[in-house]
A protein has these predicted regions:
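Catalytic/RNA-binding core of pseudouridine synthases
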Residues: 1-175
Length: 176
């Protein structure tokens, strides 16, 4: 059987890790040389470019590019995972206007220093941060430079705010 070469675009469903998608493709295509171009959270849905065969040589070119995400912010809730999959730690009433929300979103545009969340696939000493977090451990993470090129509010129905974010690689939307 001929090996596939190139890049394919997969629509990742909620509940699967990026690694799950690659593992499934390895089984379907009977190939070992397959890789994705960046980790999407298990709860995220959307485009996951996957490199096959010689296409894996292009991964660095793709991962250095800006990325665009759509997300829904739920104002007034703090969770242990910084997303809605986690346990609620704090809840408070939201008393802001749409204009104040837009102003805060605009304030994030540009260069920022961002601390990666504990619930992320970033590795420390060979172990993924989310594995350590599930064990109840917290480790110090260094702030990293990221850039928000654009943050556009798509819908505002307080306390929910749907946004489109165009940002640099390595940016965690959940930390907004």
């Amino acid at each position: 059987m001929a090996e596939f070469q190139g890049i394919i675009v997969i629509h990742k469903e909620k509940g699967f890790t990026s690694h799950d998608v690659v593992a499934k493709l390895r089984g379907i295509l009977h190939m070992k040389k397959i890789g994705h171009t960046g980790t999407l959270d298990p709860d995220a849905t959307g485009v996951l470019p996957v490199a096959l065969g010689k296409g894996t040589k292009l991964v660095d070119l793709l991962t250095d590019k800006e990325k665009t995400y759509e997300a829904v912010l739920h104002l007034g809730i703090t969770t242990d995972t910084q997303d809605m999959s986690g346990a609620v730690l704090k809840e408070r009433e939201v008393s802001v206007t749409e204009e104040e929300v837009k102003e805060v979103l605009r304030s994030f545009v540009g260069e920022q220093m961002q601390v990666p969340p504990m619930y992320s696939a970033l590795k420390v000493d060979g172990k993924k941060l989310y594995e350590l977090a599930r064990e109840g451990k917290t480790v110090e993470r260094k702030a990293r430079p990221v850039c928000f090129y654009e943050i556009e509010p798509l819908e505002i129905h307080l306390p929910l705010v749907k946004i489109r974010v165009t940002c640099s690689k390595g940016t965690y939307i959940r930390t907004l």
